[in-house]
Amino acid sequence: MTLWVGCDPGVVSGAIGALDDYGNYVESFDIEHKDKHILALVFKSRLLSIIDPKEGAEICLENVHSMPKQGVVSVWNFGRAVGVISAVCELTRYPVHLVTPQKWKKHFHLTADKSESLDMARYLWPEAKLKLKKDINKAEALLIAEYLRHTLHGIEKQKTA
């Protein structure tokens, strides 16, 4: 059974969400950092710990860009974080796919309002314990994983109750 992994990158707010072939919740976690630096080895170890090598995985990384009016330091820190996260995902040797926020959100009929993503993820995966507002990144990572599962795997395999 393939593990479907979604990644919402960020300097201090990156997260991973993972689902099984049927869209059932497997895991979600924040990507650890220290002083605005992603802890790459910790991230790689944690990511590989949820993937069964016999089963394999497909990883979907949100393809993000700097935002207008961000400062130079913010853009640099964000770009560095995205680069580290992307490199770690590539080094797992599992397929890595990119999707823009607009594309996966449109798939779920969501707007740019992050609270909509949190509400949808809470509804789809109540066992994920997305209780806090700060869990938005884990929620979006799970939705990115579900987007990948829908688009690559098809939606004939539905989430089990």
Regions found by a protein language model. Give the residues of each.
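Phosphate- and other anionic-substrate recognition elements at nucleic-acid/protein interfaces
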Residues: 1-161
